[in-house]
Amino acid sequence: MDYLKWRGDLTFSQDAFNEVDNLLLSFVAYVNLEGLSVGAGEERVALEELSRRFFVLHSEEELAADKSFTRLAPYIVKMMAQSNRYRTSLISNYVNMVNPQLELQFSAVQLDLMDGSKNFCFRGTDDNIVAWKEDFNLGLGEVPAQKLASEYLNRFGVGTSPIRVSGHSKGGNLAVYAAAACKIEVQERITDVYSNDGPGFVHEFVTSDSYKKIQNRIHRYIPDSSIIGMLLENPVEPQVIKSTAKGILQHDAMSWQIEGPHFVSASLSESAISLHETLRNWLENIDENARTQFVDDLFSILESTGVDTLTQVQEGGLKNAAAMLRELHQIVPGTWSELENLLKAVLPFSGFLIMGRQKTVDRQNIPRAVTSHRAIHTSNKNHNENKVKQEEKRK
């Protein structure tokens, strides 16, 4: 990463914590730290030593098998561990909980930087379908991971040090939620909250007193064609970042452009604005049961492929598209428009699904008389063709 190559030699006493540092800490949260003795109540380990342990425990072949967009996180941490800026940072209190039955995925880690701060980083969404469903369930009220995030911050945020809270994707949502819901003695020491393309919240939360107490400490960053970061309500004005990727692939923060210690600014695309407005207007006019049904419908389509990740859905191409089309036919027509908008944003081959669904609808809407006429016409055509073939054989 260019930032570490050009500025990694600068300690925090030489150059203060900035927005790019926040994003780097979010990458640390994506690394699997199981078995490295940095769990809750275990050691505090310097990042340099942590990285060494990680690459002893995990082979290059194992890491190469990871096809998710977070696959580069261990290598980013390795670069951080080799820099003056981060190598002596202390890592601790790593937790990781996954329960598909409860649609729960929660992970967090603490980093103590040499500027005297405690930094709590929440893992976001990789491209696992279960994790993405939890993202969308955020629109239905509190999810288990949010409650765990506030409990985590209360447990490990004790002391006198200044606190930063951050995360990418769902991790950004958890960072904001935890900062708003934590104990007042912890909340008073929070200097900054960072949400990197994190989804928003239900209306009741963003209008609550607890949210308003930390609202002016929230920094929100989204790429120029953001999808996840535009979900639900988020009163904080975002800084829009130029990305080298397209569509949902912009959610990969490795595509975000950086210049010095800052992100490169851009304007929000029309597609991002349109999708946000469409979903917002629709969600405002339906009840909680309809919202739940919408989320279930969307993910029943994705899960019909039989794979675990969005990467695998895309790699399956038309085979997976066919499975999804069959599932789409089972969906109540009232949600088709909104489902199609999301599928178009997420999957490159979704046009096939929408065309296939529309052709089916068109066939279903053909009047019986027209269908009968077509059947008679086809029968007569086949009869005439057979008659010609018989004449040719006689000759």
Provide a role label for each language-model segment.
Residues G167-G171, A175:
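Gly/Ala-rich beta-loop-alpha elbow adjacent to hydrolase catalytic centers
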Residues A175-I184:
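Short glycine-enriched nucleophile-adjacent loop
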Residues M1-K118, F122-G139, V143-P162, K183-K381, ...:
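Alpha/beta hydrolase fold serine-hydrolase catalytic domain that processes acyl esters and thioesters
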